[in-house]
């Protein structure tokens, strides 16, 4: 029975709860269809628009009423996992009911372990939250945080993007997956968590969702790692007259293309890096980058870019 880990982008879930309720129907149908064919499925998702919406809402409320409590970015991330999980689970259980399948779907609120010494914490560069007119206002609204001027649009909080090291509860996640459950985990890359002398503590940060899910895929011993995104293939010379789609590349070819700056840093590069991380972790590991609505075709080898060792 082949084990598949699927990574959904946060943008695939829309920009508000109403949109999201509709948009989760597609991945739910796709996941259950694969389950029906005998695959084991673990599903992960992004949360960029969702965590931004939650964090901005609390920030706006505090500007209206100073007595409104400040909600840390880490807690906003956990909240986003909760309501995305609710919508995904409801859609999955409805599809399981429709298909008359006895499987269970489970959602793990994910805390991803990172190193407190990660260099990213010395150079936070991921902007989050609302814009403020002045540096003073931004610092007042975001105590103990780094704020920067953002392209002439105002001042904004920035957080680090540390590398994932492990996941709290990974053995329970793996056990549930091996029992045949449809597992949802790794939302938004997980809430960054460090281990201190006194125990675990969450920290503000944004973990790359695809990289975190590639690590989870390794730990649950998946055979296939699929990243679903907005394009049907990975391209070189993207957007240029000599644009060329890639149907299958090996790790050596991928590294050569990366060195030639063929993949955009903020979009395709981290996806290719996540795929390499998974494929290089063992033998007979395959990764695919494909379009959101083409999951079955991608697994059948009809569409998408396959990355092999």
From Swiss-Prot:
Gene Ontology biological process terms, A to Z: arginine deiminase pathway
UniProt-annotated stretches for the region Disordered: 125-144
Molecular function GO terms recorded: carbamate kinase activity
Cited SUPFAM superfamilies: Carbamate kinase-like
The entry's keywords: Kinase, Transferase
InterPro entries assigned to the protein according to its UniProt record, in alphabetical order: AceGlu_kinase-like_sf, Asp/Glu/Uridylate_kinase, Carb_kinase
Family of the protein in this entry: Belongs to the carbamate kinase family.
Name of the protein in question: Carbamate kinase-like protein
């Amino acid at each position: 029975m082949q084990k598949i880990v699927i990574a959904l982008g946060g943008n695939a879930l829309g920009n508000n709860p109403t949109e999201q309720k509709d948009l989760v129907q597609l991945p739910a149908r796709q996941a259950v269809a694969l389950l029906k064919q005998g695959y084991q499925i673990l599903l992960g998702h992004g949360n960029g628009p969702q965590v931004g919406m939650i964090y901005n809402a609390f920030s706006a409320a505090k500007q209206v009423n100073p007595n409104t409590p400040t909600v840390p970015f880490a807690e906003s991330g956990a909240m986003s996992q909760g309501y995305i999980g609710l919508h995904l689970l409801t859609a999955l259980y409805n599809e399981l009911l429709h298909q008359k399948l006895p499987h269970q779907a489970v959602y793990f609120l994910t805390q991803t372990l990172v190193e407190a010494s990660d260099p990213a914490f010395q150079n936070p560069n991921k902007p989050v939250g609302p814009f403020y007119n002045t540096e003073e206002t931004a610092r007042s609204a975001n105590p103990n945080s780094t704020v920067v001027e953002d392209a002439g649009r105002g001042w904004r909080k920035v957080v680090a993007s540390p590398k994932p090291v492990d996941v709290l509860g990974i053995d329970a996640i793996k056990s549930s997956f091996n029992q045949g459950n449809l597992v949802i985990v790794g939302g938004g890359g997980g809430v960054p968590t460090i281990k201190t002398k006194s125990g675990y503590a969450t920290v503000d940060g944004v973990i790359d969702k695809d990289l975190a899910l590639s690590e989870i895929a390794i730990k649950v011993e998946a055979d296939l790692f699929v990243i679903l995104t907005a394009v049907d293939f990975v391209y070189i010379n993207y957007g240029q007259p000599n644009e060329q789609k890639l149907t299958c590349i090996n790790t050596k070819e991928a590294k050569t293309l990366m060195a030639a700056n063929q993949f955009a840093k903020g979009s395709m590069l981290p996806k290719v890096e996540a795929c390499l991380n998974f494929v290089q972790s063992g033998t007979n590991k395959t990764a695919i980058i494909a379009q959101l609505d083409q999951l079955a075709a991608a697994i059948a080898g009809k569409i998408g870019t396959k990355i092999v060792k």
